[in-house]
Every structure is written in C-alpha cells, then in structure tokens.
Amino acid sequence: MQQQSEISKQVFISPDLSDNYNNNNSNINTNNNNSINDYENQNNGLVVPQSNQNQQYQDDQNDSFDDDSMDEGEEKSNLIIDESQQNSLNNNNNNSENNNINNSENNNINNSENNIHNNNNNNNNNNNNNNNNNNNNNNNNNNNNNNNNNNNNNTINNNNNNNNINNNINNNNNNYNNNNINNNNNINNNNNNNNENNNNNENNNNNNENNNKFIGSPMGEPQINNNNNNNNNNNNNNNNNNNNNNNNKNNNNNNNNNNNNNNNRKFDDQQIIKDLENRLKEAKKTNQLLDEKCNQLKKNITEKNHLLSRYINTLNSSVLQKKTLNRNRSRSRSRSNSRSHSRSRSRSRSLSSISRSRSRSRLIYSRSPSQSPQKNNNNNNNTNKSNSNNNNNHFNNNNNNNNNNNNNNNNNNNNNNNNNNKRKSEDDNQDDGKKKHRKNAIWTQEEDEKMAQLYNKYGKSWKAIHSHFDDKTREQVQSHGQYLIRIGKLEDIHRDGRKERRKGKQALQERQQQLEQQNQQNNNNNNYNNNINNNSNYNNNNNNINNSINNNNSNQNNYSDNNSNNNNNYGDNNITHNNYNDNSLNSSNYVNNDN
C-alpha cells in the first residue's frame, strides 16, 4: 500500500488527470479480485478466501471441542496446510499487486503523455482555426470594402450616364428643332415657288384665253399680243427657274455655313481654351509680381515706420531741449530784471535822500540871513540871488527825480508785460506738447494686433509690452490694454493670479493646436472638393466632346436632308421646265391655228 501511495503521488501530474487516476485505482482493485478468483479456480476450490478460512478454522475448533475423536496430528497437519495456503496467497497477492502497479504506472504515464500530446494538438488545431477565422474575416472585410467601392463607382457611373442621357436628349431636341426649322424653311420656299408657278400658269391661261378671243382679227394685232404674251410667259418661266436655282444655291450656302459654323465652333473652342490657358499663365505671373511688390512695399513700410519713430523721438527730444533752454533763459532774465529793479530803486532812494538833505540845508541857509540883519545889502542881494538859484535848482532836481521815477516805472511795467507774455508763450508751448502727446495716443488696427500678440506672449506685464511701443507711455499702454480686455477683444489671462497665467498659456497652446488641426482639415476638405471639381470638369469635357460628335452627326443628317430637299427642288424645277415646254407647245399650236 505504501508503494501504491508513492506511485500515485508520482503519477499525479495535473488536476485534469485525476479521473484517470481514480479509474486506474478501480482497475487495480478489480484486478486483485480477479487474480484471487483465478488462483482459487486453479487450485480446484482448495483455497478459500481469508474470511471463509477464519470461519472454517473456528468451526474446526468448535468441532474439536465437541468431538473427542480428533487427534493432535491431524490438527498439526491442518495448521501446516493453512500456513502454506496463506503463504501462497500472499505471494500471489504480491505478484498481482506488483503487476497491477507496474501496469497502472505504464498505463498512466502513457495516458498522460497521450493526453498532453492530444491537448497540444487540440491547441494547435484551435489556433489554426482562429487564424483561419481571422483570415476569413479579413477577406470578408476586404470584400465588403471592394463592394462599397464598386457601389460608389456604380453611382458615379450612373450619374455620368444620366448626364450623358440628358445631354443626348438636349442634343436631340436641338437637332429636332433645327430640322423643323430647316423643313419649315424648305416648305415655305416650296410653297412660295409653287404659288409663283401657279400664278404664272394662271396668267398664262388667262393670256391664252385672251389670245383665243382675238383670233381672226383683220389687222393681225392679236398675233402680236399672243407673241408678247408667250414671251412674257417664257420670261416668267425663266425667272421661276432662276428663283429655284437661287433657292438651291441658298440651301447649299446654308449647309456650308452650318458646316463652317460647326468647324469654327471647334476652332473657337480650342482657341478659347488656349486663350484661357495663356491668361492663366499671365495671371499667375502678374500675381507673383504683385506678391513681390507687396513684400517690397511691406519692407519699405516697416523701414519707414522705424525712421518715423526715430524722427519723432528726435523731435520730442529737441522740443524738450528747447523748453529747458527757454526756462533757463526766462529765469536768468527774471534775475537780471530784478537786479536792475533793485538798482533803480536804490538810485531813486539815494537821489530822494540827497534832495531832502539839500532842501533842509537850504531852508537853514535861507533862515540865517533873516536872523542876522547886521550884514550889508550886497550880501543880502547875493544871498537872495543864491537862494533863488538854489530854489530853482531844487525844483529842477525834483523834476529830474520825478522824470527818472516815471522812466523806471515804465521800464518795470514793460519788463513785467514781457515776462507775462513769455510765461504765456511757455504755457502755450506746454499745451501744444500735451496736444501732440494726445495725438500720439491714437491706436490703429495694426497696433491693436501687435498689442494682442504681445499680450498673449507676456500677459499683463505692461513694462514688457511698453518696450515695443516707443510712441506711447506706459500708462497709455496699460489703459488701452485694460480697455481692450473690457471690450472683449482680449481675454483676461490671469484674472485670479499667476496660476491662471500658466493655464492661459496651456489654453493658448491647445487653441493653436486646434486651429492647426482645423486648418489641416479645411485644407484636406478643399483638396477633396478640388479633386471632385476636377473630376466633374473632366466628365463635363468628355460630355462636351461627345456632344460635339453628336452635333457633327446631326449636321451630317441635316446635310443629307438638305440634299434630299435639293433633289426635290430639282424635281420641281424639272416640272416647271416641263410646264415651259407645254407653254411652248401651246404657242406653236396657236401659230399653227393662225396659219
């Protein structure tokens, strides 16, 4: 049993083989039972199974106890027989177990190997089946695609056939109308000719009747009238023949004209195509030249804009320098004027003090002689003269001082007026500068586009944006950018902080990618539409060629119809010629009657 358990462990390879193992164990048990039965049958029923043997042994013992006649020798012989039987049974069992175990091992190993091979074969078969199925599916898909393409081609062919049918119908209608027109013209011509012939015949008959009335006149005038009438009839017949010939010529000319028109149309179409191709080439050349000129003009404009910006900067700097110089000059002038004013004031004060001192001294001198009456009269006269002279000098000095003061006041007023005028002019210059500054604050569309590009690049860093605008101040740039954001022309990229700026950049990149994809899609759609248009143009050209062929055929048919009409007219002319012969016979008969 231990060997059998070890073998079962060795044989257990996979859970899938557990059923085989159980079956093998059942086979082992059945083989054991069969071997025991075979052994019993071989020994002719001498050996009993172990359970029966034990029962028999007990029965013998019971019999021994019951029967006193049994001997001890018989008991020993029975025991020996039992031991030999047991040994033989054990040997047989061991042999049968070993055989069965070996057989089971071999069977299990072979079965497991066969099962493994079978499983591998099954897997390979399944893989092959899957590959075949995939190939079949691919073939089916390809067939479906081919069928779809064929259906599309069939629809295109059907459309082309419908177009051809419509074109053929139109051509047939046109040919039918042309034929009807030609037939109507021919009918009208024939009717006119017949009417003319009938009228001529009626005139001839009337003339014949009149001639018959005047038969037997004595003067022979009726004969002259008859001859004149016959001549008139002959002339009418000749005119009819000429008219018929002219009609035939006209018909031939019409046919020739139709053919020439068709040929001219072909030639004209070819010339038109060539002219259009030449125009396209010339237009392409002109477009290239215009593009080059536009690029040159753009370059010149950019260069001139740079020069203008530099020129404006130099002008602004020169204006500022002039303003600073004027301010410095006005300050220096005001200082010099103040110094002159102070000097004039000091002079006036000194003169006034001198005059006052002199007046006081003179009063003292004038009082002194009155207080000293002891002096001579000469002295009095001298003193009076001197006093009068002094008084006159005093008045003259006062007048001079007053004149000087007036002159100084006038000078001061003039200087003040000049300074006020200068200040006003400086203020005006400042106002003009502000106005010029405001004029530079006007924004153009190009500047707005430039502003949008810089805003998308730098965000709300107005310093970086202002570095690209030399004409504007930083405040103007910022205010204009905020105005564009308020209007909606610019998006507020970082409304809540720096993080939004990064998001804005990512959004811009995504938008740029979307725009590129849209442009690619639009280009592909345009190319597809162009290809469709080219195919339709190709089909239209083919249809036009077919139509031209059909028109040529219809013209040939018309030519044949015209020939038939000409033949008919020729027959009518023969009839008129026969009528002419009949008339000539009538005239000869008339002459014979006269005779």
From Swiss-Prot:
Location(s), subcellular: Nucleus
Stretches of Acidic residues bias are at 60-74
- This protein is called what? Myb-like protein D
Under SUPFAM superfamilies, the record lists: Homeodomain-like (SSF46689)
The record, for InterPro entries, names: Homeodomain-like_sf (IPR009057), Myb_dom (IPR017930), SANT/Myb (IPR001005)
Q: Where is this region: Disordered?
A: 1-47, 55-74, 82-266, 319-445, 494-595
Composition skew (Low complexity), residue ranges: 19-47, 90-212, 225-264, 349-368, 376-420, 517-595
- Organism superkingdom: Eukaryota
Major site of localization recorded for this protein:
nucleus
Q: Which residues bind DNA?
A: 462-485
- Return the Basic and acidic residues bias intervals: 423-434
Pfam families noted in UniProt: Myb_DNA-binding (PF00249)
Basic residues: compositionally biased ranges: 324-348
Keywords in UniProt for this one? DNA-binding, Nucleus, Transcription, Transcription regulation
Question: In which organism is this protein found?
Answer: Dictyostelium discoideum
Q: What are the annotated GO cellular component locations?
A: nucleus
- State the Gene Ontology terms under molecular function: DNA binding; DNA-binding transcription factor activity, RNA polymerase II-specific; RNA polymerase II cis-regulatory region sequence-specific DNA binding
A biological process (GO) of this protein is:
positive regulation of transcription by RNA polymerase II
**The keyword DNA-binding is assigned to this record:** yes
Residue span(s) of domain HTH myb-type: 435-489
